[in-house]
Every structure is written in structure tokens, then in C-alpha cells.
């Protein structure tokens, strides 16, 4: 959850709720003068209007072509909740978000993802090329600690015969996984921190344990629970396609998709103050830069 994205969502909700209210009433009164709804709306529109009208417009465009169910949103929401563990409610509160408003943002993100996937090349030729470097999902457990000395202490306890799950519960700072013995959800290549992923895939057999691995989060000790098993393209095709589509969800591809969807939707901006809101999508930005 990027802070900018979260704060932006809060601002957007405030901005357009004011627009719906209208009436020009006061939002603040002082002896020196009042701040009206119109003044606040105009100020927020000037600063944030283009960004938010983009999202609202694309919600309409994409929502008309692609379907995201409540179940889809709930599934993604639970993934975030699991990722942040006990800190999830605090993160939402600190960002001024409720579960409802965060789910609204998740729905938009999923619409963009579905549109991008629908525009991806999923021919056998493309999938077979991807299959050359594809690796199946693996399942591992980890113990995360803050410093190298603590990691070496845990490593020694493992060598002395202590159970991995017991040490995860005792030492791991990952609150989302420690009570489950440190086990993470299955993941494939490109999904985790590169150093963590490299060390995890280097473990070939069930029960293999890594040396301490440093990442931006601290030091990890990783245990292989379910190693990768690559068979043939035909047998692996479903999993390959899922991983391939996930790999296509880059900023560049999403931007290309939004440009295509914008062009197909016959968009007309009727508010002169927001006439440049879609310059990155209608080609006017490149025209301006060439002048």
C-alpha cells in the first residue's frame, strides 16, 4: 500500500463528495473570513482534479468491459491483510482509510489488471518462449530477524536440532507468518525480494535450510517445504499462463492498455479546467513536447 496512493484516495473521496453536495456553504468560519465549500472544491480540483478524474473515468470505461466481483476484491483484500498481519488495521487508520474505501481502490487496480491481461499476447509461441525461463511455484517457511547476530544464533539452534516452526514462533518478527511456523504462501519467480527468491530456489529438497539471507526487511533463514517440479509445457501450461500474465502487469503495459481503452471509449472532457487531464492518453502530451 503506497502512501501516495492511499492519501490520494482519501483526497478523491473528499473532493467528489463536496462536488455532490454543492450549495456553496461554509466548511470553516473565522472572524477573519469563512472558507466555503466552493473555495475548498476549487482548490482541491486545481491540485488533484486531473489525477482523480482519470481514475473515475477509467473506472467507468473498464467497468463496462471487464468484471471484477466482490469475491475478487475480498480475496485481494485478504492477501493484503495477511501480508501486514497485526499491523494492517494500524496502517489503514494512519492513512485515513476504512476497509470499505481501501476495497474501492483495490477494485480499480483489479480492473486495470484485467484489462492489461486481456490485451496481452497469450499465444502458444509467447507462452513457450516464457516457459524457457519459467520456474514453478515453491512453498517455503522463513524466520525473519532484525540483525545478523540474531540470525546466526537461530541458525546455530537449528544445527543443534531445534525445530524450524518452533524457532519461527519464538524469534520471527514477521507477525503474519510466525504463528504458522513461518510458512509463506506459494510463490513463483519474480514475486519476492530478489535475494530471498534466489536463496529459496537454491534449496532443492524438502527440509533444506538456507544460511542467513539479507534483504531490505532484515535477515531471513529459509526452509524448503515444497520444491519446484517442472514437467512439460503441455502439463504446466495453465500455471505458465498465470505466471506469464502476472509478468505482463508492468507499469508500461498498463499504460499502453489504458491508452488503447481511452481511444476506444470516445472520451470528451467537457470541463475546461480539466482539459489536460488525459494528455498522457490522447497523444497531446507528445505533441506539446515536439513544439
From Swiss-Prot:
Query: Where's it found, cell-wise?
Result: Cell membrane
Domain PpiC per the UniProt entry, residue ranges = 135-226
Lipid-acceptor residues (N-palmitoyl cysteine): 21
**Taking the first listed entry, what is the main subcellular location of this protein, grouped into a coarse class?**
membrane
Recorded hits in InterPro entries, A to Z, give:
Foldase_PrsA, PPIase_dom_sf, PPIase_PpiC, PrsA_foldase, Trigger_fact/SurA_dom_sf
Leader peptide range in chain numbering: 1-20
Record-stated family: Belongs to the PrsA family.
Recorded protein name is: Foldase protein PrsA 2
Species of origin reads Listeria innocua serovar 6a (strain ATCC BAA-680 / CLIP 11262)
Q: What is the lineage of its organism?
A: Bacteria, Bacillati, Bacillota, Bacilli, Bacillales
